[in-house]
Design a protein with these regions (language model features):
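Extracytoplasmic/lumenal domain signature
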Residues: 9, 13, 54-57, 61, ...
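Elongated alpha-helical scaffolds
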Residues: 34-37
């Protein structure tokens, strides 16, 4: 008989790219068409111009750009392919233009040459929410980001320097959540003379309104400490202790609502039954011999608490074992605390007022303005900066540097006591740049505390002094 081969749409396909060079296929990604990144450019595999479905009888392979790829996987943003060029120091954008019926190539890293040209890109990651950002891991351990919003034609580059000694980011992962994309980093550092590797996650912005003020985290390798964690049940869940019975006095307090015995040295205040502050603001401390239902105190009760009064635990000693020997930044109840050095896995706070604390490593957060433009007929004229107006959103702890001078933006009013928590500032803040020279045309803005700094806009007023 005669043997025949039937070719059907379900047959597997094997292609050889027709090219003048020996091209290595480095990645394949699905966009508007199937894209093949090679060592000699990017090819597209599709059925036909009228039907993109690939079958054994209908297929097309076209080379759309000669800009080579690397083995770093690209990202796709709104059907635009973004990939590192061979050498890993340029970023190419490949976009299909319906009006011109062709793929258009753009080198979007041109304005970031000074920060991207010193090392190679090893990984890309795309974060869609809350802000559209392309993250890039460099082989020297730095992290670059490109804020990328095609709808408003917005692109902005940033360099991210992580806190700690010899800090290097070795990997990144994006985990989509219901209302945002979670960004995870793997970071290596030298801690207490040894190299440590930790997995860290970026926390949420204040503007997202999902994180309490006390838990805002603007430190690296950070840890959140809660006073409630000092009293937990057998499953490790926090317990709330209540005063059991009115008219108590002396140095013993009968409690209920908790099954755990407080550790010696546990500090607390007695609130009202509804959880608000009472007239007794004394900070009590448990001593040896306490039980789950009877707490021995270091002093006599100042007044008889009401039945079912809430016992609010307070922090004084924090355990930060993963940063042994390091100087750490601290926030207590949403306000900056003096730096401390971790010794024997612990740091001791300067006060006993906080229910929540955040500890971690400081990182550099700053921005420098460009030299402002001049009129067409004033290119060689002298100019001097007069004022800087910043549009600030939910921020504190901002300092301006220029001409070897520093000026801190003040957000605390004369009616607020030093150390008293103040609200994050939102609005315009105008700063006079007094004493700035005619030859200084840039201003640096720094975050100087473990609190948020978000600058949404800058306006500079200047004067010109003739040629």
């Amino acid at each position: 008989g005669v043997t025949t081969e039937v070719i059907s749409a379900s047959n597997g396909l094997y292609f050889t790219i027709d090219s003048d060079t020996l091209d290595e296929i480095l990645w394949i990604i699905d966009s508007k068409r199937l894209a093949l990144g090679t060592s000699a450019g990017v090819y597209f595999l599709y059925g036909s111009e009228t039907n993109l479905t690939v079958t054994p009888q209908r297929f097309t392979i076209n080379k759309e750009t000669s800009y080579s790829a690397t083995n770093v996987d690209p990202v796709v943003v709104s059907n635009v392919i973004i990939y590192p060029q061979r050498g890993g120091r340029e970023i190419q954008e490949l976009e299909f233009s319906g009006a011109e019926d062709q793929w258009l190539q753009t080198r979007i890293s041109m304005k970031a040459y000074d920060i991207i040209s010193t090392s190679n890109i090893t990984k890309l990651a795309w974060q869609e929410r809350p802000n559209p950002i392309i993250w890039m891991i460099m082989d020297d351990g730095r992290v670059l980001s490109l804020s990328y919003d095609r709808q408003v034609k917005f692109k902005a580059w940033s360099v991210h320097s992580l806190g700690g000694t010899d800090a290097k980011v070795t990997d990144i992962a994006i985990i989509p959540k219901s209302d945002y994309d979670q960004v995870w980093f793997q970071v290596s550092r030298t801690i207490n003379g040894a190299t440590k590797s930790y997995v860290e996650v970026l926390t949420r912005f204040p503007s997202e309104n999902v994180t309490t003020r006390n838990e805002l985290t603007f430190l690296d390798c950070a840890k959140i400490h809660k006073a409630t964690e000092q009293l937990v049940d057998s499953s490790g869940d926090p317990e709330t202790a209540l005063v059991n019975g009115a008219s108590q006095s002396g140095t013993s307090l009968t409690v209920d609502g908790a099954t755990a015995t407080p550790a010696t040295g546990t500090r607390f205040v007695i609130m009202k039954p509804d959880g608000t502050a009472s007239t007794d603001t004394t900070i009590y401390e448990t001593i040896a011999g306490s039980s789950a239902t009877s707490w021995n105190l270091d002093r006599a009760l100042a007044s008889a608490p009401a039945d079912n009064s809430v016992i609010e635990l307070r922090l004084e000693e924090l355990t930060i074992a993963h940063l042994e020997g390091e100087s750490v930044g601290l926030c207590t109840n949403g306000m900056e605390h003096a730096d401390e050095t971790v010794s024997s896995t612990k740091v001791t706070l300067d006060h006993q007022l906080s229910t929540t604390a955040v500890s971690g490593l400081f990182y550099n957060a700053s921005m420098t303005t460009l030299s402002p433009p001049t009129l067409d007929n004033q290119y060689n004229w002298n100019k001097r900066l007069l004022t800087l107006t910043a549009l600030i959103q939910e921020s504190l702890g901002i300092r301006i540097e220029y001409n070897d001078l520093t000026e801190e933006l003040l957000f605390r009013s004369t009616q607020q006591n030093t150390g008293e928590p103040i609200s994050l500032f939102t609005g315009f803040r105008k700063q006079t740049l007094s004493g700035i020279g005619w030859d200084v045309h840039t201003v640096k803005i720094n975050s100087i505390s473990p609190l948020p700094m978000q600058i949404n806009g800058l306006s500079i007023e200047l004067e010109t002094g003739g040629p």
